[in-house]
Amino acid sequence: MAAAVRPGAEPWNRVRIPQAGNCSTLTVRDPSATLDICTAAVTKGCHLVTQSLKSQTLDAEVDVLCSVLYSNHNRLGHHKPHLALRQVEQCLKRLKHMNLEGSIEDLSQLLSANATQPGATENRVVPSQPVVEVVLMKVLGGCKLLLRLLDCCCKAFLLTVKHLGLKEFIILNLVMVGLVSRLWVLHKGLLRRLISLYEPLLSLRQEISSIHPMPYFKDFAFPSDITDFLGPSYLEVFKVKTPAASATKGVTKLLNKLFLMREQLPKMNEDTLDRLSKPSEQMTSNPQSTVDLGQPVKACKRTRKEKPLGFDLRAFCTRLGNKATQETNRDFKYSQSKLKTTKLPSQQLRTHWANDTVQRIRKTKTFAQLSEEIEMAIVWSRSKKLKTQATFLGNKLLKSNRFRHVESQGYSLTKKLQCMKTSLCNCLLRGSRTSTSEHPPRQRRSKYKVLSRQRKPQRKLQSTLLKETQQVPEGTLKNTRDSSAKRRCSGTVQRSDVCPNGKQVLRKLAKPDLKTKVVVHGNLTGGSRNESGFQAKTQMHTHNAPDTAKEADDIDDIFALMGV
């Protein structure tokens, strides 16, 4: 019957509290007025708590929190504001797994059953003591958990504001600040409603225990005052004013720069006011603007010599003649030539600026000085519309700012400073080093050139071998018949390197017949074929000749000398 509690573990601190196994309702005859008052207060409190738990705004904020954490996990996984938001998410998940909403709904359904039943004045159905005690325990645990959630929200708020002072991820930090503040407000209202629900629940438990005592948590005494149970964290949230953060001084200036109110906008100069007032004066001085719309206006006809007063649509409908096209072409050519002449000085200015910034970067000794130089470089590159260089320098600025804060705590980062300086100098000297769009075509061109260079000597070798094989003597064929016959008897053909021995033999040979020329050419073009194929070719080429067997033997001897 009673809930088993582990030694040292408090029952309100558990995520899952087991339900009572006995009957959940109790019929009371002739209920007292105090019982009616308690049940009415409990039903009202349960309705308010369920309304705040099921609010769509709270669900939307929780969904936004989960999506922000999921989308920025890889980029901001080790940042302190991100970790604080992770703690907020853990508290929300624990609150969901407690099933506080379900237990409160069950209790409200048991209390509202008396209104539907007839004759409820004589007999009253109330929840049993174990059901009320389970809800009381969940209310205590929910209040403690909500206090922890509010603390995590405050911590995340302060860390995001501090991170906002670094001028990094400004939009994301603003979103996180607004999200955390809204979650803090919503859950503070939920905590207030849970605290107001605890007192009528405790009085209802006392009334039910006096009618039919059936305790569920025997080793735990429910506190009479929940504020004493919650401790100083409750006073920090509700009664003590939160102190202003010291790190928000620079943040307010930054936010004022980003979001200026209409009252804070700078006043216009007299020159701008005069410029704005001139066209209005011209409009008033124009006689056409002073026409009374209530009277009929006489349309005055224009003569041919008079020019149109305002916008004429027929000028756009007429086609341009040859003279106009020639003038436009001349203007376009002149603009192109002007661009070519102005291209060299812009490149010279860029190289001069890059050399100056590299010298200044090399002289820096701390990350604070380096970040200042990077900021100046970013401003210059953005003014010259160098997007790739600006993005590269922006990423380096983020890293240097982080190392600057680490360096301010007393750590020496000389190696990291040197590495960052070298990477920045290389980027500035080589121009668009970070852009990867230029590298693949260069690699393809170089590979194509290497392949074309390697193919040319192969063609030369083939032509020289053809020329040399055409010079084959008749006297050496007889000397090589014996070696070819021996290899035929053994039945194995040993293949070795063809080029060196074949070249030496072919250089010593004399001119052959016309028939042998055709056969050797077939060997060089199709070197992967076997001896039977070559013999078939020789027979097809020399089927009219009487001594085909001798020529075939001579050809076999030549290939044997070559090692084929």
UniProtKB/Swiss-Prot annotation:
It comes from the Eukaryota. It is found in: Nucleus; Nucleus, Nucleolus. This is Nucleolus and neural progenitor protein. The keyword Lipoprotein does not apply. GO terms for biological process: negative regulation of neuron differentiation; positive regulation of Notch signaling pathway. Residues 460-473 have a biased composition (Polar residues). Keywords: Developmental protein, Nucleus. The lineage of its organism: Eukaryota, Metazoa, Chordata, Craniata, Vertebrata. May play a role in cortex development as part of the Notch signaling pathway. Downstream of Notch may repress the expression of proneural genes and inhibit neuronal differentiation thereby maintaining neural progenitors. May also play a role in preimplentation embryo development. Residues 431-495 are annotated as: Disordered. The keyword Heme does not apply. Residues 442-460 are annotated as: Nuclear localization signal. Pfam families: NEPRO_N. Residues 442-459 have a biased composition (Basic residues). Disruption phenotype: Knockout embryos die before preimplantation. Its main location: nucleus. One of its GO terms (cellular component) is nucleus. Belongs to the nepro family.
